[in-house]
């Protein structure tokens, strides 16, 4: 009877964190768009563009991409839309981070509100969650 050995490669979570970030910006309605009477619908999605690692910390660079649908102030009360993004860059401390470790960042949009300042200007307020985790590769030999 022969003893068989197999190598197993697994990923283990070394460290993780949770950071909630408030984002706020005012946006102007472009001259080509009609005036805003009422915001009908808003939605957003977080996109992570880059994750840089340092000694026990990471920098997450990304943007909140939003889309808005609004009712215009025209006589026919037609609908119009606009979209854009809000950039962010956050520094997050993570214990036990080393150069060869893999960092994965899970994101979620917790809250987003759009308020009308005037017919040509809107305020967007959002709270996003960044949940980075550090994974390391482990190779084990099983008999």
Kindly give the residue locations of the regions a language model identified.
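Viral structural modules
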Residues: 1-143
